[in-house]
Structures are given as structure tokens and as C-alpha cells.
Amino acid sequence: MGARGSVLSGKKTDELEKVRLRPGGKKKYMLKHVVWAVNELDRFGLAESLLESKEGCQKILKVLAPLVPTGSENLKSLFNIVCVIFCLHAEEKVKDTEEAKKIAQRHLAADTEKMPATNKPTAPPSGGNYPVQQLAGNYVHLPLSPRTLNAWVKLVEEKKFGAEVVPGFQALSEGCTPYDINQMLNCVGEHQAAMQIIREIINEEAADWDQQHPSPGPMPAGQLRDPRGSDIAGTTSTVEEQIQWMYRAQNPVPVGNIYRRWIQLGLQKCVRMYNPTNILDIKQGPKEPFQSYVDRFYKSLRAEQTDPAVKNWMTQTLLIQNANPDCKLVLKGLGMNPTLEEMLTACQGIGGPGQKARLMAEALKEALTPAPIPFAAVQQKAGKRGTVTCWNCGKQGHTARQCRAPRRQGCWKCGKTGHIMSKCPERQAGFLGLGPWGKKPRNFPMTQVPQGVTPSAPPMNPAEGMTPRGATPSAPPADPAVEMLKSYMQMGRQQRESRERPYKEVTEDLLHLNSLFGEDQ
């Protein structure tokens, strides 16, 4: 083991090997555990010689104890081994690691209570960061630290007189005198236009102060005068006078807070100048997340110098009104006056890829879903199906294929044999005749006028065609359209027969065996 195993004597090593790792467990500590603990101490920058004494182990435990709740498994194992070694040096009889930890923690708590009051950390005195501090009953001015001035300059350079500059100035100038505030303003190198605006506001407020607080006249020698507007601005007063005005017993005048208020008015005017965006123009883009839109809205609202009631109305009305259509639809479903947390939660996924995919899926589902048929259309369609007429028996309610009557031979239209209904020569055709290759006519069909039908009533004019009673009426004159229709039908029939004749002749020749074998058959 070498020197690393020499932190414990032989007797203490024997006692170490009797301590169990866990309560009720079989495994016990061995010398290799001490060697591992020495290696871990090197990682923490602690000397291995600390394990040789009780005080050294106590110092190690003080370092490791604050790290145990959030430490790794190796750190907790090292803490357990040091607790066991501490108990061995303190001649405490322990059976397992848990007992050693309890004893070590009890000793650490007792040492903490015995610590003298001078060694305990004390909080800094209140008001230690303020430029004016009270020492030995007297108020003493301390200049601003370079860190405070640097923070103010960085705030102005980074935000460029944004809405954050006003609360930042309030925090950094807390408890300052007019002298300190002028020092902060003089540190701003750029943005001299804004500085000139602040100077004009200071001059206006100083003039108003002089009008509201006129001078009472000459004061007795040695008596402190009342501050004028220029005194509050720090141009005609010293630091000592400013401190006396702020902390005197009778009628104190907080010149520092008054001057800070004037500077805030100037900064607010600069914020409006450097941020000309009106809150009415803050609208959410079609693809902008709702959270980003809310951040821009409240940033612009922060720059608005209006009454809190007006800001509350803007928040409840304009925030929902200027949202995009998708978010507006969701926000209107939240009811009246929803909280900002509810609005952010409801609009969390709007505008993202998940919401777009959901909309596309809904649109695709609607496109693939068949449109429902109205009930009236279903009844009308069912009624039409019931008017089917059978060509075989002439009855309604079924088709010819479903007819149980004997199959009628020949054409179902004219009753003749030798052809079917689709090739019936008595089909109706228009005056243009049948189409090419036996297709349907290219015009609307015309009904044939049956011959021999005479009108049942005499003509209206008796002088033109009235026959005497008892005489046989003459046949009506032939209609030229009917004659033309008949001629076209005859020509169509002839053309169809001429087209079908070659096929019939070839078929008959093929079926006739004499044409193939001659007289052998």
C-alpha cells in the first residue's frame, strides 16, 4: 500500500475492517477504501495528511458537508469514509456507515454553536451603498462607485433610451444627491440631443418651482436658506448644503428625490422620441408566435406615459383586437377578461408546424369525407327506382332480367323476330338520320305522326273546309316533314343492311361445310 495506507495505525485499521458498509450488510470496509479516499482528496485539493487526525477529518467534513445534498455518488462515498475515519480517531464505537454519519454530524453541529460571534459573518449595514451615510452621528457624502457609473453608461448605450432606461435610472440613483445625479448625466458621452432635452425639462421644472416657492427675502447670517430651482439642480448649491436640506430636523426638503423626478420626466420624453412606435400599430404577424407579439405589445405599453386605467383598457382590448385571425379565434373562446397566463397557454402552439399539420389534416379529412345526401334527395331517388318497367311483361317494379314471366321472343319494341330492340328498324330518328356506323341519331328524336288519323272536330272556318253532314271526310294532305323523315329512315335502313350483308355472307360461307370440302360431305 505504501504511504497512502499509513493514515491509520494497525489497531485503527483492524477497527475499520469491522465497520459494515451498510446496516445489516455483509461487506465491510477494507484498506483499499482508504486508498481510494486519499485519491479523491487530491481531486478536491485537500491534503491526505488531514486523515491522520480527528481535527483534520473535521476540516474535511466542513468542506464536504455543504456539497453532499447536490453532490455526486463519489462525493457522498468520500463523505461516508471520512465520517468513519473521524469516528475511529474520536474513539467512537460504530457498527456501520449510518451510525458514523450521525455521530460526525452531531460533532459538526456542536462546533458550529461554539463558534465565537466575531467569526460569524455579518450583513453589511443598511444604506451602505447610498452616497450619504451616517458616521458617528454626522452625515458624510461618499462619491458614487465606478461600478454604478459604468452600469448606468452601459444601460444607456445598450438600450438607447428604451423603456428600460427609466426604471434603471430609478434603481441606480436611489438616495443620490443632485451632485451625484449630475455626475451620472455627465458620464453619457453620446446622445447629446437627449441630454439637451433633459436640460430643457430641468429648466422648465426649476422655473415652476421658483414660482410655487417664492423667496421669503434676505435670511439672517448663518441660517440655511430655502433651496431654489437652481439649487435643486445642483448648479448653485454645494454637496454640504444639499445634505443639510435633505436631512435637517425642521422642514427637510428632499432635493435629491425632486431632482430625480425632473430627470425622469426628461427621460420619459426621450423614450417617446427614440421609440415613435404607437401602441395602436403593434399587431401580430400572420406567422409570429403569440408570446413574441405580447412581448412587443407590453414593451410599447411600457413606453406609454398614460394613466394606469388607460393602460389596463389597452391591455384588455388592443391585445386581443390586434392579434392575428388564428389567435383571435382562440382568445375569443376564452370568455370575458381572460388572464395573460390563460391567453399564453391557449395560443402556445398556434402558428407552429404542429398547428399547420393539424389544419392540413382536417382539410384533407373534409375533402375525403363524402358529402351527406339530403333526405329529400334520397326519397326522390328511391321513388325513381320504383318506376322501373319490365320490357318482357310490360309491368313496373322490376327489370326484364328479374322477370318471372316466360321470355318473349323477338324484338321487345315491335314484336318481330330476327332482330333485337337495339337494332329495331322502327327506332325513332330525327331528320338527320342515324349517326355513322349505326350510332344514335345526332339530333333529338321526332315522333312519327300515325297515318289515317283525322281530326275529331271540323275546322274553325266553315267556308274553307267544312264538309256537309253525312259526307265522307277526305284524307288530310301529306306532311312534307313526315315524308322526309320516312325517306331518311328508309335510307338509313338500307345503309345498315348494306353494312351487315358482307358479314352475313362470310359467316354463312364459313358455316357451310360444302365450301370447305366440296362434295366429300
UniProtKB/Swiss-Prot annotation:
Chain positions covered by the region annotation Disordered: 105-129, 448-484
Region (Interaction with membrane phosphatidylinositol 4,5-bisphosphate and RNA): 14-33
Region (Interaction with host CALM1): 8-43
Keywords: AIDS, Capsid protein, Host cell membrane, Host cytoplasm, Host endosome, Host membrane, Host nucleus, Host-virus interaction, Lipoprotein, Membrane, Metal-binding, Myristate, Phosphoprotein, Repeat, RNA-binding, Viral budding, Viral budding via the host ESCRT complexes, Viral nucleoprotein, Viral release from host cell, Virion, Zinc, Zinc-finger
Sequence positions bearing Phosphoserine: S145
GO biological process: viral budding via host ESCRT complex; viral translational frameshifting
Residue span of region Interaction with Gp41: 7-31
Entry text on domains: Late-budding domains (L domains) are short sequence motifs essential for viral particle budding. They recruit proteins of the host ESCRT machinery (Endosomal Sorting Complex Required for Transport) or ESCRT-associated proteins. p6-gag contains one L domains: a PTAP/PSAP motif, which interacts with the UEV domain of TSG101.
Family to which this protein belongs: Belongs to the primate lentivirus group gag polyprotein family.
Protein name, entry field: Gag polyprotein
